[in-house]
Amino acid sequence: MITSNTQTDSHPYPKIRPEHLGPNSPAGKVARMTVGDNNADEFAGLDVNDPIFDADSPTLSDQFPAPYGQAHNPSSDRAGTSPGSFANKPNIGGPRMFSSPDTPGMPAPSAKTAWDFLPDGWTTEETDSHATGCLGHNIGLTAEEYLAGKLATTYIRAVPNDPNFKPVTQLESARLGIVTPEMRRVAEREPHLTPEQVRDEIAAGRLIIPANRKHLAKNLDPMCIGRASKTKINANMGASPVSSGTEEEVEKLRWAEQWGGDTVMDLSTGGDLDATRAAILEHSTVPIGTVPIYSMIIGRKLEDLNEEIIMDTLRHQAEQGVDYFTIHAGVRKGHLKFVKNRLIGIVSRGGSLLAKWMLVHNRENIMYDMWEDICDLMREYDVSFSIGDGLRPGGLADATDEAQLLELATIGELTERAWRRGVQVMVEGPGHVPLDQIEYNMKLQRTLCHGAPFYILGPLVTDVFPGYDHIT
């Protein structure tokens, strides 16, 4: 039997060095890694001799080993429980809220929250009432106390460095201790939460309200996504160059809302994308998300994509009222080397488009380089991020490999940077993942992304049922 700390040749988890995680953030060095100029490799600009590709170095899976063999049944040491009732106490405000006990050896939650990533120059102050300040759940506690589930009792609020600062986003309002009308509406729809708890979870970065100010002015009914809330279901739809149109997409929206879809993504790649998107937003009562790069390349070559096109497209869609953008900024030039070892390669359309752009231009991901500018634009409208996982596995054989987890570490850094700009964040996740790797993936994201909501595209535990992803 393999014990929980044994490494074997068949170890399914990736070899990523622990220094990829810091010093200043869990994502740190991997998100800022550089590569050489050896053009001999088919991935132009990658130096195959760079130490970052040394498979014998200590790895991320050494720091966060997955348990094997002696995985333990939580019911054996939790008095009064029976199989199927292993839940931890549902305390609002801790990193393990509404969870089951961790399998021994899993990555621990992050001791940091969005409170640790305030804008430069901001401070915090104590308040005397929950009506005017948040429970800063990891404020005033040691990391050990916080991770053990102890809750703070001090009410705090953020103090901007500009005395005339006016909050624009739900995150900024929450940091200032403000309960917005949208938070009150969310609490009505989540009866186990109070408006103050909704605010506190948003301030911690564990909850988002995807609600573009332009869409709120129409008929959007605010909802929330995050661990403290009920599980939400997204419905994908979209017109293609050969099928569907505006009327059909609006009809799909009606069906999605009727049968309980909490959010809808318009993934149209053909037809009149602009008119279709406008019609959907005009009729939708649920948040609408898009993948803006799909529109950016309509009518032009991918290699012509530049900063002006990106910003113009994002602003136009934000003006229309799109509530969240999926942006694949976590796919970095240095990650492409690891895709060569995959059985299937890159299956994300947005990820593959940006990978090709990087290879053509022999430079870093343009979305990564523009991150702060993109954040500032999204803040104006309170558009939320759904940070895309462009290197998600397209089959079980590629699950939890170097490429996937290097990108996840980068996404952790992008989450921190977005929080510093006052923008709400959720994180996209895989994808095709074997059943025994799901918990490891979930817990590692919780660590690297500090509890930001995880918007998983599945996970799909089999590759042999194409066309039925809603079942698998």
Regions found by a protein language model. Give the residues of each.
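A ubiquitous short alpha-helical element
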Residues: 153-154, 168
